From Swiss-Prot:
UniProt: ATP binding residues: K635
Gene giving rise to this polypeptide: leuS
Catalysed conversion reaction: tRNA(Leu) + L-leucine + ATP = L-leucyl-tRNA(Leu) + AMP + diphosphate
Keyword Cytoplasm: yes
Motif 'KMSKS' region per record, residues: 632-636
NCBIfam families: leuS_bact
Localization (cell): Cytoplasm
Family: Belongs to the class-I aminoacyl-tRNA synthetase family.
Protein name per its UniProtKB record: Leucine--tRNA ligase
Length: 876
């Protein structure tokens, strides 16, 4: 019989309303079932969701719906990471208040997410800019302050003189502010810091316990924490060359074994020796100033040309006072790592080699590969950075690098300079304390007051929240809180005299470092309900982009430890399982070249194919448009597809199914119109097959078949069920999709038989059982279609509340087995035979194999050894 096409515009809102009315995705903390907490990284409310959001939140939703069906009490909340610069930019550019801009964006994005049919517990929703949320964040800040985990110090910052604000290292590009283009200045400002370095070793060691995290992310964090074991070595300075009072220079090195290859020392532009030298030389002063302006991000330092200037200062080699080395100021040495001074061994470090070649400094090889000849081993354009044997190193010659390290360390620890040991062993970390001060309005106010008499005074918890004043203006650069006529003026909580509020706000990474904890009990007066937090945490499955591998995830790991230290939670690690999904990418389209190039949106072109060639044509002008590379969807390249358009045209289930189906979830998915249309055809096919057979299926009782025509149907359904279960457990959604396609192909003919009234009762019962399994399998990915199909075949209740089906173990057992066949103990063939075949059947089948016939050459075997279910050996 003919059936109406599936209409997502009708079905999807209808089922969403039903789920909402029944509050079926609201989670109760006191539910006795085993908990499962699935969370996708919450979005910044930019105003529109993009296809990356669709993929991210669909993946989380599949996990949530699947785990719910498996009997878990699932927590799947949603909120908004709502503070930050874009809202202030909008205020400056469009004259809207950051709060109204943000909440308006939240409303429109929430509506978009709801249309996707996500099984979210919206009753726990919050935005980090809600005073109710940041009040609890201020409470945590005060607890951390009391515990000694927060402190204030003078710190060098990148200052943008046009925007009147501090820039992160990553926001300094070629010495200029990323937004204003102004030359950045270095300023000393008093800033607030979290003591993340107190946890450096623990944060590093605990990475080994995170076995459900991608190895790549763990390695990135390990490198960021950057533990190194080395030696702090004091070098005597030649007093005749020193411009100030300094008598020695302390250098941190991880390679003391290469000391005899040293040809220079290098210090940071902010080192006291550099300041002394700069005070006596305008040239050195200018160079130091240039170093400070260039930015200190690691990316900037890696790519910048290695530059230096000789200070004229000379240092005496620790093992030879007659050997003096020049001390340079260099742009690649950081004051806040080690001691702000290094020694350069050009033969063992590429950066040092480039520097030495540039400034004509000696290059002495001191380590060579074990099998090299010391007479002929030289350093060319590349330093030798491997382990090996020491050469040209006096008493170290012939030792391994490890032995040389120990020999140098032991000697220098005993050697005295000015009455104290010349060296000590040190463990260093690259990780720095987290500076959280931001000179911004749209962030969480730091709850302290500055009093001339009492100093820094915490705001009493009874006075929280310290809320942002709504009446601010953005007509001038800088922080509006500094200019506010009344907000910053307040009485000191201790002495009652006039005092000033802190006008810095917190880094927005603070807001996202504990939100997952707040979701466990967002109604609590305190930051957490420890009982609820300890019940739900860690998050069982956290899903988000690899771009957050370091900062957000590391800060969250620190925050959980700090919250444990202050009694808010009882665990160290916030995320048990981490999944980093790939991006949604799309072809780029453009016309023109160079500066005249204009990017064209996918909606403006059509693709034509002829003779195996694809070309893009502008819909309005018919001109040919250049097809460019496949890149991450971005507004700048205009290669974006609006989820609203896709959902309006095809429905949410098609969009959800497509972003899961086309490639492994950790890889990028290439968006294509053909792929989306293919997904939509599949949606329609599933609906057509089931709805046309609905009358016959509705009247039948579901029962798997043990024999006859229905047996193959039941075996296919139950085997697919078992396999897709494993796929969902591993988040291998694309594999699940492939198996579901196969099952639908298997069910097509028997469903057509039922639709035509040509199936007997046993087959119909088996197909109904299989159809129920199919609907359960697609439900996590295409929940609206699943509900519609379930209702059509006479299913009771909601699929969203139905338990996961159980596969029948007897139906998933493969009826055939493949046995290796050996001849005289060497494998020669494989035999596929019925699992329950007896000894004589196996022997007959083996003797019929060509390879066995050839080996026997007409004679009988001496014996045939059959190890049941394992192997067959023919002795000839």
């Amino acid at each position: 019989m003919a059936t109406e096409r599936y209409n997502p515009r009708d079905a999807e809102p209808r089922w969403q309303q039903q789920w909402e009315a029944g509050k079926i995705f609201e989670t109760k903390n006191d539910d006795p079932r085993e908990k499962y907490y699935v969370l996708e990284m919450f979005p910044y409310p930019s105003g529109r969701i993009h296809m990356g959001h669709v993929r991210n939140y669909t993946m989380g939703d599949v996990v949530a719906r699947y785990k719910r069906a498996r009997g878990f009490n699932v927590l799947h909340p949603m909120g908004w990471d709502a503070f930050g610069m874009p809202a202030e930019n909008a205020a400056m550019e469009r004259g809207v208040h950051p709060a109204s801009w943000t909440y308006q964006n939240i409303a429109s994005m929430k509506a978009q997410l709801k249309v996707m049919g996500l099984s979210l517990d919206w009753s726990r929703e919050f935005a980090t800019c809600d005073p109710e949320y940041y009040q609890r964040q201020q409470h945590l800040f005060l607890d951390f302050l009391e515990k000694g985990l927060v402190y204030r110090k003078q710190s060098k910052v990148n200052w943008d003189p046009v925007d009147n604000t501090v820039l992160a290292n990553e926001q300094v590009i070629d010495g200029r502010g990323w937004r204003s283009g102004a030359l950045v200045e270095q300023r000393e400002l008093t800033q607030w810091f979290f003591r993340i370095t107190d946890f450096s070793q623990d944060l590093l060691d605990s990475l080994d316990t995170l076995d459900e995290w991608p190895e790549k992310v763990r390695l990135m964090q390990k490198n960021w924490i950057g533990r190194s074991e080395g030696l702090s070595v004091r070098w005597e300075l030649d007093p005749a060359t020193v411009p100030g009072e300094e008598k020695e220079l302390t250098v941190y090195t991880t390679r003391p074994d290469t000391l005899f290859g040293a040809s220079f020392l290098a210090i940071s532009a902010d080192h006291p020796l550099a300041r002394d030298a700069a005070a006596k030389s305008a040239e050195i002063e200018a160079f130091c100033e240039e170093c400070r302006r260039a930015g200190t991000s690691l990316a900037a330092l890696e790519t910048a040309e290695k530059m230096g200037i000789d200070t004229g200062i000379r240092a005496r080699h620790p093992f030879d006072p007659d050997w003096e080395l020049p001390v340079y100021v260099a742009n690649f040495v950081l004051m806040d790592y080690g001691t702000g001074a290094i020694f350069g061994c050009p033969s063992g470090d590429q950066r040092d080699l480039d520097f030495a070649r540039k400034y004509g400094l000696p290059v002495v090889p001191v380590v060579m590969p074990k099998d090299a000849d010391p007479q002929t081993f030289t350093i060319g354009d590349e330093a030798y950075v491997g382990d090996g044997v020491m050469i040209n190193s006096r008493f170290l010659d012939g030792l391994s690098t490890e032995e040389a390290f120990e020999t140098i360390a032991t000697r220098l620890e005993k050697d005295l300079l000015n009455g104290t040991p010349r060296a000590e062993r040190k463990v260093n970390f690259r990780l720095r304390d987290w500076g959280i001060s931001r000179q911004r309005y749209w962030g969480c106010p730091i709850p302290v007051i500055h009093c001339d008499d009492c100093g820094v005074v915490p705001v009493p918890k009874t006075d929280l929240p310290v809320t942002l004043p709504p009446d601010v203006t953005f007509d001038k650069p800088g922080n509006p809180l500094d200019r506010h006529p009344t907000w910053r003026h307040v009485a000191c909580p201790q002495c009652g005299k006039d005092a000033r509020r802190e006008t810095d706000t917190m880094d927005t990474f603070v807001d996202s470092s504990w939100y997952f904890t707040r979701f466990t009990a967002p109604w609590e007066d305190g930051p957490t309900d420890p009982k609820a937090a300890n019940h739900w945490l860690p998050v069982d499955q956290y899903i988000g982009g690899i771009e957050h591998a370091i900062l957000h995830l590391l800060y969250s790991r620190f925050f959980t430890r700090a919250m444990k230290a202050t009694g808010h939670v009882a665990l160290d690690e916030p995320f048990k399982g981490l999944f980093t999904q790939g991006m949604v990418v799309h072809e780029t389209y453009s016309r023109g070249e160079g500066a005249q190039r204009e990017w064209i949106t996918p909606a403006e072109i059509r693709i034509e194919e002829a003779d195996g060639q694809r070309r893009a044509v502008h819909i309005e002008t018919s001109e040919e448009i250049a097809i460019g590379s496949i890149e991450k969807m971005s507004k700048s390249k205009k290669n974006v597809v609006d989820p609203d358009d896709i959902i309006a045209s095809y429905g949410a289930d098609t969009a959800r199914f497509f972003v899961l189906s086309d490639s492994p979830p950790d890889r990028d998915v290439i968006w294509s119109e053909a792929g989306v249309e293919g997904a939509h055809r599949f949606v329609q096919r599933v609906w057509r097959l089931l709805s046309e057979a609905a009358e016959g299926l509705s009247a039948a009782e579901a029962a798997p078949a043990r024999e006859g025509e229905g047996l193959a149907v039941s075996q296919a359904a139950h085997r697919t069920l078992k396999a897709v279960e494993a796929d969902y457990d591993k988040l291998a959604f694309n594999k699940a999709v492939a198996r579901i396609y196969e099952l639908v192909n298997t069910l097509a003919a028997p469903l057509a038989q039922i639709a035509a009234g040509k199936a007997d009762q046993a087959l119909t019962a088996a197909v109904k059982d299989a159809a129920g399994i199919l609907i359960s399998l697609i439900a996590p990915m295409m929940p609206h279609l699943a509900e519609e199909c379930w209702r059509a075949i006479g299913g009771k209740g909601l699929i969203a509340e139905r338990p996961w089906p159980k596969f029948d173990a007897t139906l998933v057992v493969e009826n055939e087995i493949t046995l290796p066949v050996q001849i005289n103990g060497k494998k020669r063939a494989d035999l596929t035979i019925a699992r329950d075949a007896d000894q004589s059947a196996i022997e007959s089948a083996v003797l019929a194999l060509d390879v066995v016939k050839t080996a026997l050459n007409g004679s009988n075997p001496k014996k045939i050894i059959v190890v049941p279910q394992r192997i067959v050996n023919v002795v000839v």
